[in-house]
């Protein structure tokens, strides 16, 4: 994994800030509600997971209707009726980042990590995926609290944890569309924002195994820009 992590001195502060911002945007993009016919799972046509009605409604409010106020209301309900769904907490954290609400970002990044870790026992694939997402969001919160330069070392440590858990998920189901979409996007964000990195491997991952197809294609297009 060391090939993903150049020295802190090699990272330009503006690049790291860009990575955090684009990566959080990617976290939102990857959770788009795509196909209502697929058991609340926009990624899989086999072994689909249910994420809960309120979380689903929040997806629709954000990505179909652009109604963030309604989405916040649905997410508040989801935290009560679907308290073990880490995606609800991840969306709360991502919306907090969008709203520059750093206290809420800090709170829900920690909850995303906690719920992801809890999910590992019953769904190791998604549990490891969202444990990785939780570490990513915590890294973003660190950068916001401490600044890009002061928070760089800890943020990179978090990034190592992100890939540790994504690798665990990949060991369980290497061709899983949700995993490959998320990991493909994160690899891509690193490749285009850090020096000496090549986006080709990320592009190939998105092309071969990620789903849904149109989001994979969006990532591929970004990689070729």
Task: Name every feature range the model reports, one short phrase each.
Residues 41-44, 50-53, 62-69, 92-168, ...:
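Short coil/linker segments at helix-helix boundaries
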Residues 1-16:
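N-terminal secretory signal peptides that target proteins for export/translocation
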Residues 2-4, 21-24, 28-98, 106:
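N-terminal leader/linker segments that initiate helical-solenoid repeat arrays
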Residues 182:
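Aromatic-lined carbohydrate-recognition surfaces of secreted/lumenal glycan-active proteins
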Residues 11-13, 117-121, 215-216:
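Intrinsically disordered, low-complexity coil segments
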Residues 88, 127, 179, 212-216, ...:
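TPR alpha-solenoid repeat register
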């Amino acid at each position: 994994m060391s090939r993903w992590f150049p020295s802190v001195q090699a990272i330009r502060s503006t690049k790291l800030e860009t990575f955090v911002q684009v990566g959080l945007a990617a976290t939102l993009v990857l959770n788009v509600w795509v196909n209502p016919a697929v058991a609340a799972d926009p990624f899989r046509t086999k072994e689909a997971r249910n994420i809960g009605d309120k979380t689903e409604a929040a997806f629709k409010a954000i990505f179909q209707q652009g109604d963030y106020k309604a989405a916040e209301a649905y997410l508040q309900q989801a935290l009560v009726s679907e308290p073990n769904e880490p995606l609800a907490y991840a969306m709360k954290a991502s919306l907090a980042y969008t709203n520059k609400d750093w206290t809420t970002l800090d709170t829900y990044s920690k909850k995303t990590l906690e719920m992801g870790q809890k999910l590992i026992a019953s769904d190791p694939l998604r549990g490891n995926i969202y444990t990785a997402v939780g570490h990513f969001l915590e890294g973003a919160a660190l950068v916001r609290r401490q600044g890009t330069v002061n928070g760089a070392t800890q943020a990179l440590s978090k990034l190592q944890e992100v890939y540790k858990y994504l690798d665990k998920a990949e060991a369980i189901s290497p061709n899983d569309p949700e995993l490959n979409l998320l990991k493909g996007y994160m690899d891509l964000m690193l490749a285009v924002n850090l020096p000496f990195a090549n986006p080709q491997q990320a592009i190939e991952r998105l092309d071969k195994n990620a789903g849904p197809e149109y989001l994979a294609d969006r990532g591929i297009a970004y990689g070729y820009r």
